[in-house]
A protein has these predicted regions:
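Active-site-adjacent loop/helix surface patches within enzyme catalytic domains
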Residues: 29-192, 196
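Basic/polar, cationic surfaces and motifs that engage anionic cell-wall
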Residues: 1-27, 32, 55-56, 137-284, ...
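Intrinsically disordered regions, especially transient/low-confidence alpha-helical propensity segments
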Residues: 42, 106, 240, 294-295
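Intrinsically disordered, low-complexity regulatory segments enriched
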Residues: 50, 248, 302-303
């Protein structure tokens, strides 16, 4: 049996971060690193920047995708020269965030929603910042494990899978905690950078083109494409829940109750002090009780014998 893909992913991601080489052999450089919360954004740079447009495109939305692949292939596909199909960010399982298209809320974009997109691909791809989550997506369960869309063994253990019924699939690849944290922090950071409100459309389709185009906030690919599987609501609802939780007021700090003391006047305090002082003086004037000296044991016996002889004589 071939090794399960899940067992190779951490090594692939660690190797890519070290040598920055995609599956086509193209090597990148890290032009800039931006720290956001616990996560970091790495701006990947290569001489060929022909995979995106630099024309005007005002950002009002964020769209979440998953790649159905692993990081080296994901980067290669999304930076294919002249293809103009890409996204701004890719988040791997280790929580690394790679920036492919320079962020500018007024320009820089690439197609990422497809021809069947509600709202039209041209309009929505310009207004929506794309985030790809490096993840294999829907899985099929077999006797020996779970298989991906390419009919490859993804994993054997259930812990790598989420049991989610969504669009005719029952199982989906589980996101790592580091990945979930990075996606959440990236979404919040982008909302701040581009003045995008925290409105969430994470389930159900947009009714029509107008609704999709006028929406401002965060949605997933599945909200504009009925033929897509990225992403099930159960996998992304945590983003909305964590944001709403962050808005709650902090719980009040419980302070220790003050120690209750009886009310006492100054006159009473003075009286008690004087009483204590008098008692001390009285004790000092008393003569000490003489200490009885211990006598040797034989002295007492001799005294008893002497007394006995005295009685006999009498």
């Amino acid at each position: 049996m071939n090794a399960a893909i899940i067992d190779t992913l951490e090594k692939r991601e660690t190797t890519f971060k070290k040598n920055l080489k995609d599956s086509n052999g193209k090597v990148f450089e890290i032009a800039e690193t931006t720290k956001i919360g616990e996560s970091s954004i790495y701006r990947l740079w290569t001489k060929d920047q022909s995979y995106y447009y630099t024309s005007k495109a005002k950002k009002t939305q964020i769209c979440l995708h998953f790649t159905v692949g692993s990081i080296t292939g994901d980067i290669a596909t999304l930076t294919k020269p002249g293809n103009k199909v890409s996204v701004h960010y890719v988040v791997d399982r280790l929580g690394n965030i790679y920036n492919l298209i320079p962020l500018n809320k007024e320009k820089n974009w690439s197609y990422h929603l497809g021809a069947k997109c509600i709202g039209t691909n041209g309009v929505m791809s310009k207004s929506a910042i794309g985030i790809e989550i490096s993840n294999y997506g829907p899985l099929n369960k077999h006797a020996d494990g779970y298989y991906n869309a390419y009919k490859q063994l993804y994993c054997v253990e259930d812990r790598h899978v989420e049991n989610i019924l969504f669009r005719n699939y029952n199982y989906y690849s589980r996101m790592t905690e580091a990945q979930k944290t990075a996606v959440y922090e990236l979404v919040n950071w982008l909302c701040e950078q581009c003045d995008i409100p925290h409105n969430y459309k994470l389930e159900g389709m947009f009714e029509n083109d107008k609704c999709a185009q006028e929406f401002t906030g965060i949605f997933t690919h599945a909200q504009v494409r009925k033929d897509k599987f990225d992403l099930p609501y159960a996998q992304v609802k945590y983003i909305k829940e964590m944001w709403e939780e962050s808005l709650l007021p902090p719980e009040p700090v419980k302070k220790d109750e003050p120690v209750k003391t009886e009310d006492i006047t100054f006159a009473e305090i003075r009286k008690n002090v004087e009483k204590s002082t008098t008692s001390i003086k009285t004790m000092a004037k008393k003569e000490p009780t003489p200490v009885k000296e211990d006598k040797p044991w034989y002295v007492e016996i001799l005294g008893m014998i002497t007394g006995l002889f005295a009685k006999i004589k009498n």
